[in-house]
Amino acid sequence: MVTFLMASPFTHFILRNRCTSRMKKRALVHGRSNIPAQASSPIGKDFDPRGYRRGLGATNKYTRKFLNDPDAKRRMEDEGIGYSTTGLVAQIKEKNFAHTKEGVTIKLADSYGFCWGVERAVQMCYEARKQYPTKEIWITNEIIHNPTVNMRLSEMGVNFIQETDGVKNFNPVKSESVVILPAFGASIDEMKLLADMGVMIVDTTCPWVSRVWNSVDRHARKQFTSIIHGKFEHEETIATASFAKTYLVVKDIKEARWVCDYILNRGATKTEFMRKFKNAHSDGFDPVKDLDAVGVANQTTMLKGETEAIGKLFERTMMEKHGVQNLGKHYFVTNTICGATQERQDAIRKLIDEKPDIMIIVGGFNSSNTSHLQEISEVASIPSYWVDTADRIDTESNRISWKTSCGEMRETENWLPQDSLTVGITSGASTPDKVVENVLEAIFKSRAKMKVRCTINNL
């Protein structure tokens, strides 16, 4: 018998310098420069991003209202885009999170898959399509990082703004169009551009992301530099940075230590500093003066433990540099860790403690939060396979195509052994239940075909 477990609670933060290669980075022009300047009036240094966004709410051309339309929710489930109430995942939940088939026992976690912010954003897209049936609808990015969901929106007639060399082409968008801002938000530059064009803006930004924006706004009002724990090329971090006056993006604790060594005059020269962070800071950034007072925020999908460690590191650095009595003048902290991200990272802890033989991570290949779930498994030295759809599992040949947390695509033959083993399975916050169900069915099908082949070979 094969036992499958779906995750429950674990704490860990990981240093990603162990990766031999990194994910291929998109050639994004960071910050505000990816907006066609001719399409919108320029943003000055005294521009108030948070105030501007709040002001949009007073117009009749902007909404972030979630209607919670039951018809939209029902359609999402029927089309395999939302939570499952009748499918395999729902059945597993009803049976005390356990299910057995083909000699395979599945144990389901209490926190995995679609988070509230993601479900809300996708449902708002369905609601917008229903509310504006005859209008052309555009979205500034993928609504979430999941191919199944984005494909379905495309089938519904939602158009995606195209991007070339980091520059988005808004030219096809007409003033009478509806434009959706995705779950991880949009830069204030894009919001202003769209408002100046006169389009109807449907803002599906997750409230947890908005909370981070409020945090960097407070940094700016105190004239502090925002240290953003994130990936500088990630859409959410680009949006967050646009709400900051001065910012620096660090991707991990290693880069944070590099910055703190510089603050304490133990590190590199200014020239070396600027070279290392050339794509990850605000225009005109000067590490000599701009690292005198800092606040820490994060991309909501980053590792909770690592964000906390980075915050503590900067706190200790500022105490050492300026003295404990002056800490408040040089360091500002707010809790911007996303509860859903934390729950899903915690949800893998118990599973790792139970030492499963294999882990399956289900989620979009460009999903940051899913990559961290894969990373946690890899660091625990558990064979872990990250797949975005069930199509990655070849049930005929017992082969799986999967991705590492570092971005490498790999293929493994005979990945599912015939012997008894324990397999853990969880999924990222952008993954619908139906995608997980399809992966489980592919595993069951692989096991059934393995039994047939074994029987034939023994004749």
Model features per residue range: what roles?
Residues 39-459:
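The feature marks the mature, well-folded catalytic cores of soluble enzymes
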